[in-house]
Amino acid sequence: MSLRRFLGLWCWLTVLAICGVLFSPRVFLAAPQNSGFRVIRTIPLGGTGEWDYVTVDSDAKRIYIPRSTHIMVLDEDSGKVVGDLQGMNELHGVAVAPEFNRGFVTGNKSEKEGTVYIFDLKTLKLTNSIKSGSIDTDSLIYDPDTKHVFVNNGDGASLTVVDAATEKVVGSMKYNANPEAAVADGKGSIFNDLEDKGQVMEYDAKTLMVKHKYSTAPCTNPVGLAMDKTNRRLYIACRGKGRTAPGVLVVMNADDGKVVTSAPIAIGVDGTVFDPGTGDIFAPCRDSGDGKTGVTKIFHADTPDKISPVADVKTIYGARTISLDPKTHHVFLIGTEKNDPVAPTAKEPHPRPEPDPTTFQVIEIGK
């Protein structure tokens, strides 16, 4: 072979190799030196009512924010309020089922009656409500494979399953533990945090049969849960013991329950998301450690078993729940800019500040 032909072949093979690396869906890229993550927008909303979860519907470009008795609906692009659904009680979270044009929101008509409210995604009108059969009806997810809504009843230590098509309760299960976040793996399983047990449970999405219970140690209080479905890794955000203790982010192999790595985070985390398009993991924490500001800890999955810190984005105190727009790669948090100090007592030596709902806002983090 002539030198010219050899060099030409070598160059061509090099190009093919580079293309294979760039376009392989399983390739992991190192975390960038300068991440560029920052608070790129705040949306002042004010208003009344407490809050828990925030939900982004990236296809409809809407943000859903339940606030005690009503749901504020925002246009994601403009930040304007496009709807405000009234007439509910003690609301927590929203899940959307676009193929049925339905939104589901967890609430409690009373302390003894957990409720799943249903609304029309187009008209933003309430259409139905269902008794959960338990108390403290809290977090929820919609699984498009089973077409079911999986509802966690926190203090009720139970699960309620609602068929999104029929709006009927089609299953239930006792956890004998306090459930927090859940995620569907797209292969027939649901994974769920059991906060007071320091465990993650895996159960069958159709039969509700428990498959496994895995220890989350060194995490003792798992509350946030996200998943890299391609590489079968669970990202578990955990609170520390006590209100002033920092937490930890744990990475677990979903197939065998082994904790492969962990990283410290700040105080009072209450959610986590994984961006499959970038490999970034976000853990929003109520308290950065100074008692005045919050922080969102951002990591990057360099490999399935290795994460590296990317950025600490300071936010307002109390911003601890989060939702991802996978199309823009931006995340959204909620909280109040003003939080009034509360005097300590013998029973509560480290009380949380009292949020001022008139300073309620949405925080958008991105690049």
Label for each model-derived stretch:
Residues 2-14:
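Bacterial N-terminal signal peptides that target proteins for export
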Residues 5, 17-21, 25-367:
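Predominantly soluble domains enriched in secretory-pathway, periplasmic, or organellar proteins
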